[in-house]
A protein has these predicted regions:
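Short phosphate-binding/catalytic loops that engage adenosine nucleotides
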Residues: 96, 125, 205, 304, ...
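Terminal, compositionally biased segments used for targeting/anchoring and flexible tails
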Residues: 259-393
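Alpha-helix N-cap/helix-start capping motif
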Residues: 114, 133-134, 303
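Class I S-adenosyl-L-methionine
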Residues: 2-28, 32-130, 242-243, 265-285, ...
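Beta-strand/loop-alpha-helix module characteristic of Rossmann-like adenine-cofactor folds
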Residues: 2-20, 37, 43, 93, ...
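Short, well-ordered beta-to-alpha junction loops that form the rim of enzyme active sites
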Residues: 103-104, 178, 215, 313
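Phosphate- and divalent-cation-binding pockets in alpha/beta enzyme and binding domains
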Residues: 52-56, 138-139, 308
């Protein structure tokens, strides 16, 4: 709306959309940040896989809406997903803080969350997605797999088939949604699992041991870990939450010429069993509280406080008693200085640890210049952020 100079602003309601995930076991894998948003929301819209998490949300949210009601039997899931995303944006359009809660990681095999964030941003509505624990994260932990040990590839079962994706047999392979191959609706069952098995047999022998994996759905349950020869995989009864892990047939050799060209010619050997050698820069975390650490912890779990501090941080920095260096680090968002202040417990101690001052007494003379720089009263200039040591003190 347009009016006089004092009212020449957009008065249309502007809501906000935040998407969070519950992880796989629900309540136990909710992050503190996600809990803070759920409790702060005007309305929480959810699609969940267990009644415990649903009950927890009803107990902690001001208002709730179950988006699973938009599913219709016999109708392609994509139609329900579109309706879910539109419902989330509809709430935000009305000026509300709406939190969408999805099972697992909200951005992994969850189309409505991505569509809602994209649509909201296109309309000028603030929208963001927070990370959460996914089924693959649980698989790595449950099977003891490090995706950084060699390489790891991740395919969706139906997509792998219809696009004829070729796996690298010298890398870990994770195949999602093996229990619902080629199923577009809400029906469950093994579907076309046999077709997936036959496709994989083009690349792996029938005797190759694979693992059918299902993450535990609650803290009182155990995961399903069922090793089986690939040729016998079709005899298993799978579920919507089933994931398949296929280990590499063999490790890939190093390209020694490339390794040598990037100065890694001698770094390709397997690690030895030698005892760890103490490093001279390490020292334990100092005892005692951190004012800056306590403030940032509070901001991590209280969205309302975070909004207020972002709008005008100075009153809050004064209220919690930050020293000049702590306040400066927070205001300029210099993560190296923030980390040092939290670790050392104060700004002057952080300045000494980072090599910006010889003593804490010297650091206490620092002040913030009118141009926003942290300066000392002595003649010796402070090192620039690019030259301050980042090694632990």
């Amino acid at each position: 709306m347009m009016g006089d100079a004092d009212n020449d602003i957009d008065t249309e309601p502007r809501g906000r959309l935040v998407i969070v995930g519950t992880g796989i076991t629900g309540v136990s894998q909710l992050t503190l940040e996600a809990v803070g948003w759920i409790e702060a929301a005007d309305v929480v819209c959810y699609v969940l896989a267990d009644p415990l998490t649903e009950r927890w949300i009803h107990e902690h949210a001001r208002s709730t809406e179950d988006l699973a009601r938009l599913h219709q039997s016999g109708v392609p899931r994509v139609h329900a997903y579109r309706a879910m995303s539109e419902r989330l944006v509809e709430h935000a359009r009305s000026g509300r803080l709406v939190v969408g809660v999805f099972y697992g990681h909200p951005g992994v095999f969850t189309s409505p969350s991505h569509w809602a964030v994209e649509a909201a941003r296109a309309e000028g509505i603030s929208a963001r997605m927070l990370p959460a624990v996914s089924a693959e994260d649980c698989l790595f932990a449950g099977l003891g797999i490090d995706p950084g040990d060699g390489a790891c590839q991740s395919f969706e079962a139906t997509d792998m088939l219809i696009r004829a994706r070729v796996p690298a047999t010298d890398a870990h392979l994770v195949i999602w949604q093996v229990g619902v191959v080629a199923q577009m609706g809400l029906q469950t069952g093994d579907g076309h699992l046999g077709a997936l098995v036959q496709y994989l047999l083009r690349f792996y022998p029938a005797t190759h041991l694979v693992t059918h994996y299902q993450a535990a759905q609650s803290v009182v349950a155990d995961p399903t870990i069922h090793p089986v020869p690939l040729g016998e995989l079709g005899t298993l009864t799978l579920a919507v939450t089933s994931t398949l892990y296929v280990p590499p047939l063999a490790a890939r050799d190093y390209d020694m010429a490339i390794a040598a060209s990037i100065d890694l010619g001698g770094a390709t050997a397997e690690p030895s069993d030698a005892s760890a050698v103490a490093v001279d820069w390490y020292r334990p975390m100092p005892e005692g509280p951190s004012r800056l650490g306590a403030l940032i912890t509070s901001l991590s779990t209280d969205p309302s406080l975070l909004d207020a501090v972002r709008a005008d941080p100075r009153p809050y920095l004064l209220a919690v008693g930050l020293d000049v260096i702590e306040a400066w680090a927070f205001l300029v968002r210099d993560q190296r200085w923030i980390n040092a202040c939290i670790r050392e417990g104060s700004g002057p101690a952080a300045a000494v640890a980072l090599g910006a001052a010889a003593t804490q007494e010297e650091a206490r003379s620092f002040f913030v210049h009118t141009d926003g720089r942290l300066v000392r009263r002595a003649k010796r200039p402070l090192p620039s952020p690019d030259t301050v040591s980042t090694s632990p003190a």
